[in-house]
Every structure is written in C-alpha cells, then in structure tokens.
C-alpha cells in the first residue's frame, strides 16, 4: 500500500515518550536488557520509524515476527540485535544466518534439516519452549535436551544463544495459569545448559511478575507497555504511569451546511435533525479507522465533535458546532485544549483492545517522529 504523504492525516510519534516508557519498564521490571517488539509494523506505529530511534531511546534489541521484517530493518542500515520470534521455513536458514538474526527454532527436525544447508555463517539459535501457550516449541524435557545436545554437537553450524517461553495470561488478575506455566518452565529447564539469552518476560510478566522469575528476569521482551498501553488496562497497574507515544491527526477537507432531514454517508444511518455543519475528513477504514469507531467524539479546536454517518473506506464525516475553515486540524487520538482522546477511550467506545487499534493502522497512514 502506498503511503499518503500528500494528505493531512498522519500519526505523530513521540520519541521522548518512547524513551520514558522504556526506562519506566526497566525500572519496574528490574530488567537490565530490553528488547522491543517491532513486529506487525511496530504494533502499527511504523517498523522503520520506530527501529531507527529505538537504540537512542534505551532499547537494547528488536524483536520481529517474520524474517522479512528483520530483513527490512537490516536493509534500512540498522545493525541492532534482532530476534525472529516466529518460525521460519528451514530453507531460509542461510538468510537468517547471513543477517545475524537470533532465530527461533521449535523442533529437532528443523535443526537437522538446517544443518544440511547452512554454510560457514553460524545460525544463532533461540529455542522455543511451550509451557502452555500451545503455539510453538517443544513440550518435553527430553525433546529440549535433545535439541541442546544437537546444537552442541553441531557447533560448526549453530550457536546456542537463546531460549524462551511465552506466558499466555501474565496480565490476568487471576494468575493461576501464569503460575502453572512458570512452574512448568522451571521444571523443563532444570539441570539443562542455559544460553546467554534466557528471556521469558513479556509485557505482563515484566510489569507484574518479574520478582517471581529468578534467573530469568534480566531481559524484558516487550511491546505493549513500551507503546504506552498498560497491559491489564489499569487492573494490575496504574495507567497514568505510562505515556502515550503517538497522536493521530487529520484536517477538514470539506465543510458544508446540511439541512434537516438529510442522510449522511452510506445507508443514511445518520439523519440530521436540524440544520447542521458537516465536515469531511480524509481517513476511513482503509487507513485502519474501523467501522466500530462510528459516533466517536473527535476533537476540533478544543471541542468534542461527534463523528456521524457510516465510516467509508477513505473518508468520514463529523458534525461541527459551527463553520470551520478547510484545513482545520482534527485530533482523533491525542490532546486538543482541555480534552484528550486516548486509546482506552476508543476501546471503551468500540470494544476493540488498544493494541488491536494500533495494529490495524494501515501503511497508507503517514507516520512522522515529532520529538
């Protein structure tokens, strides 16, 4: 998708807020090392925009989901540590070794196949251990031990550098399942050789359980919390300790006075009850501003203004208190005057969780670092 750089709609990303959240996360978790998840376009904030400023914000490494995300970062000239979290097809193992990625491996069979095609460049291996997420990774101690022994026996092709598990409910007030996974983790790794990177703390574990993870709490592998979203949405931790890292803004492209009884947008789901000033904005569900956000209060000139009518692919309308000139700034998420629209506000309005709101932002949205 083409980035719409000649359009007023944009994401304004705050470097200072990101740096603050990094330091806050390290402080709360006690982690000495923080790897920032920049998968899925950095949770919608912009893969390269965030990756380019991560190191100066205190981030010690990057984590992506797929090989192509890592390659894009490397091709942008960024030489930071990169972890590939998701499984990759074994035929691409030489590419992962070429770019010096810490590569997640989920089975001995994968290692055996990779051993046949790897060249002089060693593959840095990150072993996945399934303690209850039931997504990827080995489940038995024997399988884990066999993987480690294979890596040691084939050190000409592999470097055993990482091991991890992923907690499914570390941000849940009911920590029963977290405790079950934690206990399973320690049972599985007991007595086995550990690499230099032992990482189990996702955002929830880092914020609420770090002291319960002795020997495994020096690395925080996080995303949500650094992007300014409290993982439990205020249940287990204070929302106001984190800073929002972006604002979403646009500007009026058309303004007209509509008489009473007129339908607005597709299906005429909103009908004016009186003469109403209507403004048009160049943003829609094609940008990730979803249909679920219909009727959300936008901010214009320090006032709350209701979005009206069905949200179209590229445009939507807003009811104005009076006529505004074309080009007037509109804040969808962020501050205007005494009011602020947060991700939590949009979540309460729509039912869409904060991290899903941002991940939905499409590549068409212009992204810019503002401080």
Swiss-Prot record:
GO terms for biological process: D-alanine biosynthetic process; peptidoglycan biosynthetic process. The modification N6-(pyridoxal phosphate)lysine is found at residue 39. Optimum pH is 9.0. Changing residue 39 to A: Lack of activity. Does not bind pyridoxal phosphate. The active site is at 39 (proton acceptor), 266 (proton acceptor). It catalyses: L-lysine = D-lysine. It is an enzyme of class 5 (isomerase). One of its GO terms (molecular function) is lysine racemase activity. InterPro entries: Ala_racemase (IPR000821), Ala_racemase/Decarboxylase_C (IPR009006), Ala_racemase_C (IPR011079), Ala_racemase_N (IPR001608), Ala_racemase_pyridoxalP-BS (IPR020622), PLP-binding_barrel (IPR029066). Its cofactor is pyridoxal 5'-phosphate. The keyword Ribonucleoprotein does not apply. CDD domains: PLPDE_III_AR. Pfam families: Ala_racemase_C, Ala_racemase_N. Disulfide bonds: none annotated. Its EC number is 5.1.1.5. Substrate binds at residues 135, 313. Keywords: Isomerase, Pyridoxal phosphate. One of its GO terms (cellular component) is cytosol. Homodimer. Belongs to the alanine racemase family. PANTHER family: ALANINE RACEMASE, ALANINE RACEMASE, CATABOLIC-RELATED. NCBIfam families: alr. Catalyzes the interconversion of D-lysine and L-lysine. Can also use arginine and ornithine, but not alanine. This is Lysine racemase. It comes from Oenococcus oeni (strain ATCC BAA-331 / PSU-1). The lineage of its organism: Bacteria, Bacillati, Bacillota, Bacilli, Lactobacillales.
């Amino acid at each position: 998708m083409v980035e719409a750089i000649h359009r007023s709609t944009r994401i304004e990303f705050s470097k200072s807020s990101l740096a603050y959240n990094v330091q806050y996360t390290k402080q709360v978790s006690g982690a000495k090392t923080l790897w920032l998840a920049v998968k899925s376009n950095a949770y919608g904030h912009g893969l390269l925009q965030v990756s380019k400023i991560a190191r100066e914000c205190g981030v010690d490494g990057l984590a992506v989901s797929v090989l192509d995300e890592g390659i894009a970062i490397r091709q942008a000239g960024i030489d930071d540590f990169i972890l590939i979290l998701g499984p990759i097809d074994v035929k691409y193992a030489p590419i992962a070794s070429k770019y010096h990625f810490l590569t997640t491996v989920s089975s001995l069979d994968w290692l055996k196949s990779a051993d046949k095609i790897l060249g002089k460049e060693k593959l840095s291996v990150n072993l996945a251990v399934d303690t209850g997420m039931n997504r990827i990774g080995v489940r038995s101690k024997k399988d884990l031990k066999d993987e480690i022994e294979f890596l040691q026996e084939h050190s000409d092709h592999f470097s055993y550098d990482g091991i991890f598990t992923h907690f499914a409910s570390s941000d849940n007030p009911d920590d029963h399942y977290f405790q079950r996974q934690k206990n399973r983790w320690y049972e599985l790794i007991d007595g086995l050789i550990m690499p230099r990177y032992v990482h189990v703390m996702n955002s929830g574990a880092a914020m609420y359980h770090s002291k319960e993870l002795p020997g495994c709490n020096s690395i925080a592998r996080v995303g949500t919390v650094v992007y300014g979203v409290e993982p439990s949405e205020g249940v287990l931790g204070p929302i106001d300790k984190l800073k929002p890292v972006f604002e979403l803004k646009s500007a009026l492209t058309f303004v007209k006075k509509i008489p009473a009884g007129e339908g607005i947008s597709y299906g005429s789901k909103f009908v004016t009850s009186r003469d109403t000033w209507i403004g048009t904005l160049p943003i829609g569900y094609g940008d990730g501003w979803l249909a679920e956000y219909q009727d959300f209060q936008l901010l214009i000139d320090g006032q709350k203004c209701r979005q009206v009518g069905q949200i179209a692919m590229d445009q939507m309308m807003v009811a104005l208190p009076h006529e505004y000139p074309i080009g007037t700034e509109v804040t969808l998420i962020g501050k205007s005057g005494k009011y602020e629209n947060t991700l939590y506000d949009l979540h309460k309005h729509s039912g869409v969780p904060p991290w899903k709101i941002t991940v939905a932002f499409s590549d068409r949205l212009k992204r810019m670092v503002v401080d």
